[in-house]
Amino acid sequence: MDEEHIALYPFASEVSAYVESLRVSLESLLNSPAFRRSRVRGMERVMQSIEGEIETTLIKDESWLLSETLSYPFAQILVACVDDQLFTKRYALKEAEAASKWLEKESTDFLLEFGEDFGIQAEAEELQFSMHFADYIRFSSSIREPVWKLTNRQLRSGMVVVTKKDFVRLLQEAIKERIEKSFPIPKIPSEVSSFCAPYVAEIKDKFEVHKKKFGTTDFGVVEPDLFPPCISHALANVQGGVNLAHSMRFAMTSFLLSVGMSVDEILNLFNVSPDFDAEVTLYQIEHIAGATGNVYKPPACDTMRTYGNCIGKDRLCEKINHPLAYYEKKIYLKNKEKEMEKEKEEKEEKEKQEEKKEEEEKEKQEEIKKKKKKEKQEEKGKKIKEGKKRERKQEKETKRREGKEKQEEKKRI
């Protein structure tokens, strides 16, 4: 990938190696006047992601290439410091949309190579692209328009045929997914947070104004780690190629739909099952999702026990009566823990700052003491010096007087 493409697609895998080769330290990126343009542009792309579209103007000079490339890691630092899940999703979406506009102008060969960076193995013939249906489902599942459903696509020997425009749209989803997964950034140094604080305050103020315009789901991002044991067990079996009983398949599917997973995402989970049939499975999932007008809810714990699907019961299970209640409680506890951790970090940071302030004050007082001691010693030395000077003067005067007296004595004799 040449420097121009690196600047346009800074989230590509090989860009990190290029940035490392520039030998620009984090401290330099944050503080050096040489990278002021990168910081300004980084803040600009973050603010533009809130306001509407991230605009990129291709200039093709060395200065622009450097500032545009380094503006991305600076923007990432700002997004990480904001630490808001909805904002992160918004930023990732707008970066992906901005990139897709440039991808539309790229050659077929470049698009195929670019797709490989995201694990998409595709082929192209004339103006059409073909890709494996699993890759198609992975990146199309978050697109809600009916035209993107697998049943509405041309399928040939497990390969989905799409136009160049649609292939670029899928690449956009791949970019969005990669950027979202790059957050949160663990353990941001306190000095970085302090430096970014004014930027972050401005970003948060702007985001709060626009927040109501952005959509979100009831549960937010789906978090499989927080699923109840019964659903986690079912998922592990499905991914291991084990064929689930009908009642467990229904329970798992209805649960996943309820927490925000799309039909195509769930379909992709079942594609390793020994009896997998894409059309039949898709029909079953859509039926549970409400294709016939009746949306099915996941069964309660009592029903799960009746059918022998209550597996791996833990302590939290004793306090709830529905798998969704388990998931809600886990999300609450995680958010509470995160909030407490944040408060703890803020408290530790505050204590650290106070200790630093006390230390600085102590050092300041020590400096004052040293200065006073030095001044006292200098004053004492000065007095001693002046005393010795007076003694020498008196001694000299005494000798002069004695000499004069001797001369007068001689004259009298």
Swiss-Prot record:
UniProt binding sites for [4Fe-4S] cluster: 230, 301, 310, 317
GO MF, one annotated term: 4 iron, 4 sulfur cluster binding
GO cellular component, as recorded: primosome complex
The protein's required cofactors: [4Fe-4S] cluster
Basic and acidic residues composition bias: residue spans: 340-356, 362-381, 388-413
Region of interest (Disordered), ranges: 340-413
UniProt keywords, alphabetically: 4Fe-4S, DNA replication, Iron, Iron-sulfur, Metal-binding, Primosome
Cofactor note: Binds 1 [4Fe-4S] cluster.
Source organism superkingdom: Archaea
A single GO BP: DNA replication, synthesis of primer
Assembly notes: Heterodimer of a small subunit (PriS) and a large subunit (PriL).
Family: Belongs to the eukaryotic-type primase large subunit family.
Function description: Regulatory subunit of DNA primase, an RNA polymerase that catalyzes the synthesis of short RNA molecules used as primers for DNA polymerase during DNA replication. Stabilizes and modulates the activity of the small subunit, increasing the rate of DNA synthesis, and conferring RNA synthesis capability. The DNA polymerase activity may enable DNA primase to also catalyze primer extension after primer synthesis. May also play a role in DNA repair.
Name assigned to this protein: DNA primase large subunit PriL
Native species: Methanosarcina barkeri (strain Fusaro / DSM 804)
